[in-house]
Regions:
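Short secondary-structure boundary/capping segments
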Residues: 34-38, 71-75, 119-121, 136-140
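Leloir-type glycosyltransferase catalytic cores
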Residues: 1-15, 133-196
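Histidine-anchored nucleotide/phosphate-binding helix
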Residues: 20, 33-50
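Short catalytic/ligand-binding loop motif for oxyanion handling, primarily in non-cytosolic enzymes
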Residues: 27-30, 63-67, 112-113, 130-133
Length: 196
């Protein structure tokens, strides 16, 4: 998801903005993420029913490309809501997150990215980053966890759990070396302007 331009929302609307993240049908994170209590439709309706809110529904890139099914079939009757903007095209998700007030996910990793940007995240399933006191958990976590800071969650996820390999040398490297290579080699993408 690092291969597209930043998004710029062009709108005169001043309402509270909620970003709702679609996931592909059959995604293991949905299957094993305790998503029985709420459906994708329930999550979207919860967002749409918030007073004075505009909802941005981001379709999964693989769904938008026609490679996998998403959840649009369950929400066709909601697509004409005046406070709903559907984004199907691929874009830099962090640039979109920075322009909203909060993020709703089932179990998508986008919720973790939103936490790292400082946005409130509501989880309608149980992703690995829920239950630590950082998210609004709509589904209770079965095994209570201790409170964590965003920094501690980041360290556990990216520094302790992951191994990094340099894209050129294919040798183990630090996260900093990997990020530096990505920044230096990322092609320039024109910003994507979305009017609403």
């Amino acid at each position: 998801y690092n291969n597209s331009g930043d998004v710029e929302l062009i709108t005169a609307r001043k309402n509270h903005r909620i970003l709702v993240i679609d996931q592909t049908a059959g995604d293991n994170a949905i299957v094993y993420g305790q998503c029985e209590t709420y459906s994708f439709r329930d999550m979207l309706l919860t967002a749409l029913d918030q007073p004075n809110s505009d909802v941005i529904l981001k379709i999964h890139p693989e769904t938008a490309a026609g490679a996998k099914d998403g959840n649009l079939t369950s929400i066709q009757d909601l697509l004409d809501r005046p406070n709903l903007k559907v984004i199907g095209q691929q874009c830099n998700i962090v640039s979109l997150i920075k322009q909203v007030d909060e993020v709703y996910v089932m179990t998508s990793g986008v919720g973790l990215e939103a936490l790292m940007v400082g946005k409130p995240v509501s989880c309608f399933g149980v992703p690995f980053y829920s239950g630590w006191g950082l998210t609004n958990d709509r589904v209770p976590v079965k095994n209570p966890r201790r409170q964590l800071s965003v920094e501690s969650l980041f360290a556990a996820t990216f520094l302790k759990y992951n191994l990094f390999y340099h894209p050129e040398t294919q040798q183990p490297c630090s996260m900093d070396d990997c990020i530096e290579w990505i920044v230096k080699n990322k092609p320039f993408f024109e910003p994507i302007k979305l009017e609403w």
